[in-house]
């Protein structure tokens, strides 16, 4: 048996029923709200969350909010709309471009970009990316800026720590504006906001504090990403969504979660996180999965470091005990 097998849910129907009960209990009894709002991103996590909400409450009590902006992948909106139609839920589309412009989100990032690449214009696309094959490298490598011009040529530039943090902070505004948009609609309709952060992301802090982490319910929080895919298959989530590479969808040039943050596949992430949880030795995992020990040791260290640095994201703010 491989460690991937341990993450396989043989009782998936029961898990789905329990998730539905969890949602209904919180909406009807704990929070006493009229329904649920889900931010539909066109990705698998939000698709599973929305489908579970419909199964728990019925389609008339679920609202799908679609929040594109000028740098969003057009497929995100297309997939979200088709899913909503399949689920027969009401949707609202709120374009966030003007709000983000008022925060100077695009300008802040583009000022840094133009210092590196003066030829940058509206025909160019860009992203921040971590180096390829990160686990095979001998040292920890810093994320870099990648720009695609109108001729599809790619240019790479190193970023200083200050430049990286500035671009990251500006990008986080996108997630925080999504959160405020969700809560505006939630409060005026007396609906709960349901998040879609999974365990693989939660452990490493791959969410924005008071952004996509700012929600009322997190049904997927204790499910690894590979388990979310199992639920998606059980729920018959469209293949155009399940086959799509997971992405933050916050950069004009598309970048996957693996390329932007993790530096490894979800198979590795989930297997190692499971091993940490169950105190399984690293060497045993490598032998079981036939993985290179040095590469997996580096992956283990990367996950542990992210887990430690993101502790504050999984806890309430410290308070003075008076």
Predicted regions and their residues:
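ATP/NTP-dependent adenylation/nucleotidyl-transfer catalytic domains that generate, transfer
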Residues: 2-38, 48, 52-55, 60-63, ...
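Conserved G/P- and acidic residue-centered "switch" motifs that form tight phosphate/ATP-binding loops
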Residues: 43
């Amino acid at each position: 048996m491989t460690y991937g097998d341990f993450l396989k849910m043989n009782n998936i129907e029961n898990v789905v029923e329990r998730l539905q009960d969890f949602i209904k209990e919180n909406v009807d009894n704990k929070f006493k709200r009229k329904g649920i709002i889900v931010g539909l991103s066109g990705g698998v996590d939000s698709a599973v969350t929305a489908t579970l909400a419909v199964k728990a409450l019925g389609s008339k009590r679920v609202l799908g909010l679609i929040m594109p902006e000028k740098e969003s992948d057009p497929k995100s909106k297309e997939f979200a709309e088709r899913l909503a139609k399949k689920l027969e839920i009401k949707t609202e589309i709120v374009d966030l471009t003007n709000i983000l412009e008022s925060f100077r989100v695009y300008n802040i990032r583009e000022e840094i970009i133009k210092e590196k690449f003066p030829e940058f214009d509206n025909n160019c696309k860009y992203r921040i990316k971590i180096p390829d094959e990160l686990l095979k490298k001998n040292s920890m490598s810093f994320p870099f800026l990648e720009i695609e011009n109108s001729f599809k040529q790619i240019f790479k530039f190193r970023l200083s720590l200050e430049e990286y943090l500035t671009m990251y902070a500006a990008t986080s505004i996108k997630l925080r504006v999504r959160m405020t948009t969700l809560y505006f609609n939630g409060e005026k309709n007396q609906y709960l906001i349901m998040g879609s952060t999974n365990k693989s992301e939660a452990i490493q802090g791959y969410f924005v504090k008071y952004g996509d982490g700012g929600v009322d319910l997190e049904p997927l929080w204790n499910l690894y990403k590979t388990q979310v895919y199992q639920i998606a298959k059980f729920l018959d989530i469209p293949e155009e969504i399940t086959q799509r590479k997971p992405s933050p969808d916050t950069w004009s040039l598309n970048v996957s979660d693996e390329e932007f943050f993790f530096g490894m596949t979800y198979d590795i992430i989930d297997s190692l996180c499971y091993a940490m949880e169950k105190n399984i030795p690293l060497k045993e995992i490598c032998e079981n999965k036939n993985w290179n020990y040095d590469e997996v040791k580096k992956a283990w260290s990367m996950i542990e470091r992210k887990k430690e640095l993101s502790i504050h994201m999984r806890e309430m703010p410290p308070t003075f005990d008076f």
